[in-house]
């Protein structure tokens, strides 16, 4: 969030359209809350995984398991199953070559960096539902984007649409978590 503001100020960009997916969507949402004067608009895509109260404990436990797998099995091994997860089925079906490239690039990520991110960012971040008071006061025009098969993000994204006064919601059919890669022309 602060990194986005710093880059804009450093480049003397007074206001920008800011787009983020997944963890980047979460950063974009927080940017809109903390620095509305710097944002022309926001696109918040695939945000809110792990936010639903009834699933929060399992989400945190899964984050620990995945972090350990990154450390013990290595990124290449974990990427084999992570890239093929249920929220990427449509990506593989629509664009097998693009999906294979995604999986290859995922396998090249730092295992240590990924483990630290799971524990220190993903697991530690608050639920979007905990931000309700702030979100109700948000003034930046915001488009919430989600794939209809990105199950962990559907309820949080609907909540964002209902809570942020300036928000619109775009649900892409037959799309999972990687909506930017699955539907690049939109």
Region spans (language model):
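Conserved acidic catalytic loop of the alpha/beta-hydrolase fold
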Residues: 1-16
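Short beta-strand immediately N-terminal to the catalytic nucleophile in serine-hydrolase-like folds
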Residues: 18-20, 45
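Gly/Ala-rich beta-loop-alpha elbow adjacent to hydrolase catalytic centers
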Residues: 20, 24, 28
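Flexible "cap/lid" loop of the alpha/beta hydrolase fold
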Residues: 29-34, 38-73, 77
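Catalytic histidine-centered segment of alpha/beta-hydrolase-like enzymes
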Residues: 175-185
